[in-house]
């Protein structure tokens, strides 16, 4: 071995041994622009890509806790857990799918409901968790939604729901389809009593959820570029055998065609919802914007 080979060999071995392994989960790739992002920075930015502003999917519990005032959250119907009444089995047993989803997410089911305050205004909030079996709606989702709506009715306070779902849970068959009617019925009761219901549609909101509670808000809001519809675009294209328009079923397309009321950036969601709740309950705005302060001055 020559002197240069000895030096190069020593250098390469020392550099490789000095390399430290990067812990798993430190970096995340944006699902839109594919930019590699520091995970902690992404969390601070509420899972919105700082490079392209893509709104990535957001954990349901984190979403609700970041929406409500600090230390004000009280979970509603946390004890409810899905049961395999039909002993359903496809490629896997339903109970095995539930166990796997519960282990992966740390949640009992795909829907979380809470009571708390938003800028000191009492509200009831709920969110689907897409990571739990695609945010599918089963019996527990319907029961939790009704319990949350009943709390809003009892306290005469607004109800805000974030949707992120592939639709009804097929493993519960007709029991899951019944939840469409069940949730729609309690929302009709809320409307009769004049209790505000604000629906926030996030990516994706599809199937039986979009065909029931998600589109029944007194105000329907969407996050940017959220996929919203009944069947997905691929299924529609295969059925009609035509190419769909650019951006079909995205939030911007729906806003342009009058299917939703507004699109709100995630960073602005908390203040926007607070203003809407104040307006809809005939209460003063819970905080002053910079524009209002300038006008008053």
From Swiss-Prot:
PROSITE patterns for this protein: COA_CT_NTER
Cofactor binding notes: Binds 1 zinc ion per subunit.
Compartment(s): Cytoplasm
Region annotation (Disordered) ranges: 1-23
Necessary cofactors: Zn(2+)
Recorded GO MF terms: acetyl-CoA carboxylase activity; ATP binding; carboxyl- or carbamoyltransferase activity; zinc ion binding
UniProt keyword annotation of 4Fe-4S present: no
Family matches, as InterPro entries: AcCoA_carboxyl_beta (IPR034733), Acetyl_CoA_COase_Trfase_b_su (IPR000438), ClpP/crotonase-like_dom_sf (IPR029045), COA_CT_N (IPR011762), Znf-ACC (IPR041010)
Domain called CoA carboxyltransferase N-terminal: residue spans: 26-295
Residue stretches spanning the membrane: none
Catalytic activity: N(6)-carboxybiotinyl-L-lysyl-[protein] + acetyl-CoA = N(6)-biotinyl-L-lysyl-[protein] + malonyl-CoA
EC category name: transferase
Chief site of localization: cytoplasm
Disulfide pairings: none
Keyword Transmembrane helix among UniProt keywords: no
Subunit text: Acetyl-CoA carboxylase is a heterohexamer composed of biotin carboxyl carrier protein (AccB), biotin carboxylase (AccC) and two subunits each of ACCase subunit alpha (AccA) and ACCase subunit beta (AccD).
Role, per record: Component of the acetyl coenzyme A carboxylase (ACC) complex. Biotin carboxylase (BC) catalyzes the carboxylation of biotin on its carrier protein (BCCP) and then the CO(2) group is transferred by the transcarboxylase to acetyl-CoA to form malonyl-CoA.
Family of the protein in this entry: Belongs to the AccD/PCCB family.
Record's protein name: Acetyl-coenzyme A carboxylase carboxyl transferase subunit beta
Origin organism lineage: Bacteria, Pseudomonadati, Pseudomonadota, Gammaproteobacteria, Pasteurellales
């Amino acid at each position: 071995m020559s002197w240069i080979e000895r030096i190069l060999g020593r250098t390469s071995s020392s550099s490789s041994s000095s390399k430290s392994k990067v812990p798993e989960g430190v970096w995340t790739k944006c699902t839109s622009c594919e930019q590699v992002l520091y995970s902690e920075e992404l969390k601070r930015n509420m899972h919105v890509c700082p490079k392209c502003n893509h709104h990535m999917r957001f954990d349901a519990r984190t979403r609700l806790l970041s929406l409500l005032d600090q230390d004000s959250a009280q979970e509603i119907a946390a004890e409810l857990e899905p049961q395999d009444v039909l002993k359903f089995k496809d490629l896997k047993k339903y109970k095995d799918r539930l166990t796997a989803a519960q282990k992966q997410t740390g949640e009992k089911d795909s829907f979380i409901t809470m009571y708390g305050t938003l800028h000191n205004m009492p509200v009831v909030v709920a969110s689907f968790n897409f990571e739990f079996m695609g945010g599918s709606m089963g019996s527990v989702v319907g029961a939790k939604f009704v319990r949350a709506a009943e709390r809003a009715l009892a306290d005469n306070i607004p109800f805000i729901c974030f949707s992120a779902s592939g639709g009804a849970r097929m493993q519960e068959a007709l029991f899951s389809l019944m939840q469409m009617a069940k949730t729609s019925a309690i929302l009709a009761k809320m409307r009769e009593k004049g209790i505000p219901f604000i629906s926030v549609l996030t990516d994706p909101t599809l199937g039986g959820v979009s065909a029931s509670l998600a589109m029944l808000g007194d105000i329907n809001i969407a996050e940017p570029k959220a996929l919203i519809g009944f069947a997905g675009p691929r299924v529609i294209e295969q059925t009609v055998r035509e190419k769909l328009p650019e951006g079909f079923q995205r939030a911007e397309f729906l806003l342009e065609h009058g299917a939703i009321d507004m699109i709100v950036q995630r960073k602005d969601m908390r203040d926007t919802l607070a203003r809407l709740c104040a307006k809809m309950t005939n209460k003063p705005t819970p905080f002053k914007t910079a524009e209002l302060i300038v006008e008053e001055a």
